[in-house]
A protein has these predicted regions:
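Active-site helical microenvironments for divalent-metal-assisted chemistry
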Residues: 1-216
Length: 216
């Protein structure tokens, strides 16, 4: 199991040295907000944003707003916190809002919402990078913790909705082109590795998302 204290200490030292004041506030806030929460496999929930932030640093992400968004991306949806009260600037609050999905009652409306959600990510660079890292981290854990159908749904969603948006983003955010390329490549490789384990379900979800995305 990942050592939360070591990850937290590493990030705090890096962020302090890099002068990332917003991310330092986000780091402390996220740890308190996620205190006591666990993932499906029993791992402390804070490991998820910490892992994402460490990966972002390794990729060369040096944007304070992006790292802070990564650390805070689940606190509104999972910790019952209000975005307007987060202790960070308005750019980060906006990005966290982009990362938060409104849920509906029917499966159809959920799919429509997801299509709209991914398309709108193109308007927010911080949320876009955060979502790519979020999806990579989640996909890596899915085969062991999700049903075959749930895993297939997320793989199809990634291929049909997220990867095309990341490709478009290279033109809009030229300074992030290298990072976007690495994220797209890694996500594609991971999807290709998982897909054979749930191919039948993946075919179903891929058709559903493609059909809905064509409408949007």
């Amino acid at each position: 199991m990942p050592n939360v204290e070591k990850m937290y200490t590493y990030l705090r030292g890096y962020l302090n040295g890099a002068g990332m004041s917003e991310s330092l506030k986000a780091l402390q806030y996220a740890r308190k907000a996620h205190d006591g929460q666990c993932r499906r496999d029993g791992t402390p929930y804070i490991v998820h944003p910490l892992s994402m932030a460490c990966y972002a640093v390794a990729l060369g992400v040096a944007d304070d707003n992006i790292i802070a968004t990564i650390l805070l991306h689940d606190v509104v949806e999972d910790c019952d916190r209000q975005v307007e009260y987060l202790p960070v600037n308005d750019t980060i609050k906006r990005a966290v809002k982009y990362m938060t999905i409104t849920t509906f009652d029917t499966d159809t409306s959920k799919i429509e919402t997801k299509c709209r959600y991914f398309n709108e990510l193109l308007d927010c660079r911080e949320a876009l990078i955060c979502k790519a890292l979020d999806r990579y981290n989640n996909l890596a854990d899915m085969p062991a913790n999700f049903t075959s159908d749930g895993t297939a749904k997320n793989v199809a969603e990634t291929e049909v909705l997220l990867l095309p948006i990341l490709k478009k983003a290279k033109e809009k955010y030229a300074d992030l082109a290298d990072i976007l390329f690495v994220l797209r490549t890694n996500l594609t490789t991971l999807c290709d590795a998982i897909k054979p384990q749930c191919y039948g379900e993946w075919t179903k979800w891929s058709c559903i998302y493609k059909r809905e995305d064509t409408k949007s």
